[in-house]
Regions:
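Small-residue-centered hinge/linker elements
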Residues: 20-121, 130-171
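Positively charged n-region of N-terminal signal peptides that target proteins for export
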Residues: 1-5
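C-terminal motif of bacterial Sec signal peptides marking the signal peptidase cleavage site
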Residues: 15-18
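Sec-dependent N-terminal signal peptides
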Residues: 6-13
């Protein structure tokens, strides 16, 4: 009889533990720290490379297991870290993006402008395959904008209006 109760109690505990497991986040949600690479030279001054790939959005990217910060959050985090490093003399944004939401593109535009004003660092934009709409707009504070000969760029149609002129046409 005691064995019967033991089996029932063990089964209940296993089921309860299976339903109330602690949430363990295996993958980090926070962005990685900035990594430094010495490509050439021995000087102390640095150039920061920030890639802008994909849709510019302020929504976190959700995967099957974890979510990663949005592109805007990642870039703002890198810019904030760069403001603390006085050895960064220039920031190179490598862009391959079709643009994105108006607000997200405008946030990056203002973050880049504020960084440039606070630090005096040079801002360089390198446009790769695609830099249209919001990606083009966020590039405007740059000191230098370079586009590959095959880059598709422009198309800043960030606000689209469709006026209704039916009443006007009837007159």
């Amino acid at each position: 009889m005691k064995r019967h109760y033991f089996i029932i109690l063990t089964t209940i505990l296993v089921l309860i533990m299976g339903c109330a497991t602690p949430r363990i986040n295996i993958f980090s949600v926070t962005p990685d720290p900035l990594k430094e690479y010495t490509l050439e030279g021995t000087g102390a001054d640095k150039i920061l490379l920030i890639p802008i790939y994909g849709l510019i959005s302020d929504n976190p990217k959700k995967g099957l297991i974890t979510a990663t910060p949005s592109l805007v959050e990642q870039v703002v985090s890198q810019i904030n870290k760069a403001q603390k490093d006085k050895q960064i003399k220039a920031v190179l944004f490598k862009i391959n993006s079709p643009g994105g939401t108006i607000t997200a593109s405008d946030l990056l535009y203002h973050e880049i402008s504020a960084y440039k004003e606070k630090t005096g660092s040079k801002i360089v934009i390198s446009m790769m395959d695609l830099a249209t709409s919001g990606a083009y707009y966020m590039s405007l504070p740059a000191d230098i904008i370079m586009a590959h000969p095959t880059t598709i760029t422009g198309s800043v149609g960030v606000i689209s209006l469709q006026p209704k002129v039916k009443g006007l046409m009837d007159k």
